[in-house]
């Protein structure tokens, strides 16, 4: 019981701290994104203004695309995985939540997996959705705009 009480105290403290961050409440308006996602994202990324573009943020998360090629061999394109593992895991978890709860992201996932040209496997699609969410977070935090599903 004392562990549950301590956990509730820590979560209350996290909610207080997130409430102090400008634009954090805007991120919570996205259906499927919760306080743990926002607090984890902000803790891992830090000051968003140090990034010049969303590609730098994708690289930090290890979601940058790299091609496995050498000489005449052209291999598959995969994510680099050379970033922060916890941030990538957090984004993957929220991508699953978004695909389940948010109609815009579900539609995007269905499109990625069923498109005629280069359909993605389910895991690849979830990583693409995670990268999309990362770009949305970047735009919302740097430009101080509200969430627009057409973003």
Pin down the residues of each PLM region.
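A detector of single, family-specific signature residues
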Residues: 1-151
């Amino acid at each position: 019981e004392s562990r549950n009480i301590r956990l509730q105290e820590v979560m209350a403290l996290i909610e207080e701290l997130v409430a102090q961050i400008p634009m954090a409440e805007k991120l919570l308006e996205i259906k499927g994104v919760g306080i743990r996602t926002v607090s984890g994202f902000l803790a891992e990324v830090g000051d968003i203004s140090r990034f010049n573009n969303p590609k730098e943020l994708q690289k930090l998360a290890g979601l940058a695309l790299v091609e496995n090629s050498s000489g005449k061999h052209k291999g598959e394109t995969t994510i680099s995985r050379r970033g922060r593992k916890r941030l990538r895991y957090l984004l993957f978890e929220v991508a699953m939540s978004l695909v389940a709860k948010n109609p815009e992201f579900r539609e995007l996932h269905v499109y990625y997996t069923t498109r005629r040209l280069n359909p993605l496997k389910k895991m690849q699609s979830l990583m693409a959705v995670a990268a999309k969410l990362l770009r949305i977070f970047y735009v919302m935090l740097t430009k101080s705009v509200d969430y627009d599903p057409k973003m």
